[in-house]
Amino acid sequence: MAKNQNQGQIAEHSARRYLEQRGLTFVEQNVRYRFGEIDIVMKDGSDWVFVEVKYRSPSQYGGAVNALSQAQTLRIRKAASHYIQINRIDAICRFDVVAVDPDAMQWIRDAF
C-alpha cells in the first residue's frame, strides 16, 4: 500500500472516531462511483452528513483545510446526489469536511 493511501485511511479512521465522539452515527465509508467518492457517510440526528476527509503533512502548502478544489467538491456533490437517489433519502443533507493535519483536526460543518 502506498504511504499516502495508508495515511489517508488512517486520517479517515481518525475522522470517523472524532465525529462519533461528537454524537454522529456512522453509516458507511468509502462509497465509490465512477464519477466520485464519498469518504464517510454519517447521520447527525435525522440529518445525513457526507464527510470529506483531507489529510496534509506539515510540509504541504496550505494545510488540509485548503486542499479541497472546486472540481473535488463537484465530484463529491455528484456522488452524494446519486447516493441520496439510490437510497431514497428524503431528509436534510449537508457536506462537512474534516481537515486532518499531524498536529490537529478541524471539523467544518456545512463546508460547501
Swiss-Prot record:
Alphabetical list of Pfam families matching this protein: UPF0102
CDD domains membership:
PoNe_Nuclease (cd20736)
List, alphabetically, the InterPro entries matched: Restrct_endonuc-II-like, tRNA_endonuc-like_dom_sf, UPF0102_YraN-like
Source species, domain of life: Bacteria
MF terms in GO: nucleic acid binding
Question: What's this protein's family per the entry?
Answer: Belongs to the UPF0102 family.
Q: Which NCBIfam families match?
A: PRK12497.1-3 (NF009150), YraN family protein (TIGR00252)
Q: Which PANTHER family match?
A: UPF0102 PROTEIN YRAN
Q: Which HAMAP family match?
A: UPF0102 (MF_00048)
The molecule here is called: UPF0102 protein Spea_0251
Organism in which the protein naturally occurs = Shewanella pealeana (strain ATCC 700345 / ANG-SQ1)
